[in-house]
């Protein structure tokens, strides 16, 4: 009898605890059953040949009309899916943003240029394709990336008007007809320069090879590709980052200024490369809130429960 009583008490207590459940949905970006026969330039039909996204939906009580495609880093040879993927999705979900974590093709899967760019462009188009169903405003779809993923995000924001790099015989579908321009960019310690001493050589080699032609190096030097249509951008770096020095971000920020693109950049004194949300790193740990306030002040997000697009005042930094 005592055991039964304890079990009853345990069930009652646990039933009173708050339940946090995040709905997720995996979407293969090019369905092999579709007319295009799978991802362009696919080397096979294994999972590694099928770029996909995991959609993290916020709780309906806080959901707003904004979505962001997240590109984890990894030097174009791996993907940091936890601290630059899952944790970022959970953070965005907390204030209502639908988050789409992209698992793009990279060198250790056998892929380089142009496939990562094709994958992020397809991811942005896929979000627009599902915007109605997911409750997303088609003009509030951004892209965020870390390190090499930040480079990929920057190419999404600078090459959306280019002719797509589809192979001969590729059959475009309804998703391909949509715009792949992100409405905003968040670039976290991104690789930007491919033709300077400050580049991350491993990312460059994995994407375009060691002996890439000058034209391709320049194509992927994102600071040289900024135009008047490049989206508003938030950038952060740390001064102690020796893997991807902040000169990368400075070059991109100055290019944005030359084209009158709204931009904000933070260089924190402390912190190594690859911090993700930077929890537990004094000073640098404020970047997520600074980013949230920037998104709020530029009208890309709103406070949950506010039914119009008024820009609310920033909350006190913690």
Which residues are covered by each model-predicted region?
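C-terminal catalytic histidine-bearing segment of alpha/beta-hydrolase fold enzymes
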Residues: 41-43, 56, 117, 236, ...
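Short beta-strand element of the alpha/beta-hydrolase
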Residues: 64-73
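Active-site glycine-rich loops that stabilize anionic/oxyanionic intermediates
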Residues: 72-77, 239
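Primarily recognizes the serine-hydrolase "nucleophile elbow" in alpha/beta-hydrolase
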Residues: 122-199, 217, 222
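Acidic catalytic loop of the alpha/beta-hydrolase fold
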Residues: 194, 240-244
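Short beta-strand/loop motif that positions the catalytic acidic residue
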Residues: 229, 235-237, 241
């Amino acid at each position: 009898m005592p055991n039964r009583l304890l079990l009853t008490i345990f069930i009652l207590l646990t039933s009173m605890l708050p339940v946090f459940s995040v709905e997720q949905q995996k979407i293969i970006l090019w369905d092999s059953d579709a007319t295009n026969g799978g991802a362009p330039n696919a080397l096979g039909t294994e999972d590694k040949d099928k770029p996909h996204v995991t959609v993290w939906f916020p709780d309906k009580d806080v959901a707003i009309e904004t979505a962001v495609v997240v590109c984890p880093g990894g030097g174009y040879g791996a993907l940091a899916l936890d601290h630059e993927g899952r944790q970022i999705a959970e953070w965005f979900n907390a204030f209502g943003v639908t988050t789409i974590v992209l698992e793009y093709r990279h060198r250790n899967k056998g892929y380089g240029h142009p496939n990562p760019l094709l994958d992020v462009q397809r991811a942005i188009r896929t979000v627009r394709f599902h915007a109605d169903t997911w409750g997303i405003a088609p003009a509030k779809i951004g892209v965020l990336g870390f390190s090499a993923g930040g480079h990929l995000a920057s190419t999404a924001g600078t090459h959306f008007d280019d002719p797509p790099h589809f192979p001969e015989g590729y059959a475009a579908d309804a998703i391909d007809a949509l715009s792949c321009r992100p409405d905003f960019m968040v670039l976290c310690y991104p690789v930007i320069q491919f033709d300077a001493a400050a580049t991350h050589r491993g990312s460059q080699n994995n994407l375009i090879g060691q002996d890439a032609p000058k034209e391709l190096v320049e194509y992927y030097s994102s600071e040289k590709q900024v135009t008047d249509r490049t989206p508003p951008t938030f950038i952060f770096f740390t001064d102690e980052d020796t893997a991807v020095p902040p000169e990368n971000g400075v070059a991109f920020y100055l290019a944005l200024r030359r084209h009158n693109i709204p931009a904000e950049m933070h260089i924190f004194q402390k912190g190594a490369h690859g911090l993700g949300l930077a929890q537990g790193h004094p000073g640098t740990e404020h970047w997520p809130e600074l980013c949230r306030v920037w998104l709020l002040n530029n009208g890309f997000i709103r406070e949950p429960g506010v039914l119009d697009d008024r820009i609310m005042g920033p909350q006190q930094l913690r």
